[in-house]
Amino acid sequence: MRRVYSAELKLMVLDGLLRAGVRHIQLGSFVHPEILPQMADAELLFHAVPQHDNVIYSAFILNERGLGRAIDCGVKKVETSISLHESYGFKNTGMKFDRAYEEMTRLVRLAHRHDISIRVGLQCAWGVANEAALGPDTVLSYIDKLMALDPDKICLADTAGLATPKMVKEYLDIIIPQIGGKPLVLHFHETRQGGLANIHAALQMGVREFDSSLGGLGGSPFMVNTTGNFATEDVVKLMDEAGIDTGIDRLGLKKTASHLKRTLQSTALKSAI
């Protein structure tokens, strides 16, 4: 995601998401505005959003400065992650795994000290282009490192969009028993067509929480030839068809996505419905 969108547009999208029944929204990232100008308005957004008892607004962070900004905004839920592949991790954060893990350790401690829920994750869990995938056993060893921090949730991200349903099942077969009931979130990208099958495979394994974005917008500016997260409206449709009640109005989502597409005058939105 390289285009910078206005705060007004983001708040318009937020209103549509709330009207459709979405109850957990990652508003932005507290990262350096010169590196990611798309997120320069994070404070503005957190101060502008309507507050509801049943709505969670979270933020992505990478370091203690970002967490400090989140604390100042009254954020009660944050997400952070580190890359399993140092070629990507260094481009994204300027840190190799060991240093990033030390930073994550401090973040978890500080977040809990301030009564903030924190989700920790592994980027590139299913590999990156032109490098061999690490495999489920190796990924499990890194999951153990995350579990040692006692986070509130664990996330596995297919940052490069390379996972297949078979690979998803292979990973989850050994990871789910190991995390002992710790909530697991999956973060997929629709880099290749048919990727919703990955979410379907995870649903069959019992996973119920996935990252998504309206219309499939997004994607890492540090990863070449990737797309955004799965479109929220497509994920909700899949769950509806599986008999899983999300409490989200799919038609309301589609209406908001269509309005966003007209506003942007862009073909960037990738939802299938």
Language model region names:
Residues 1-273:
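Catalytic cores and adjacent flexible loops of soluble metabolic enzymes
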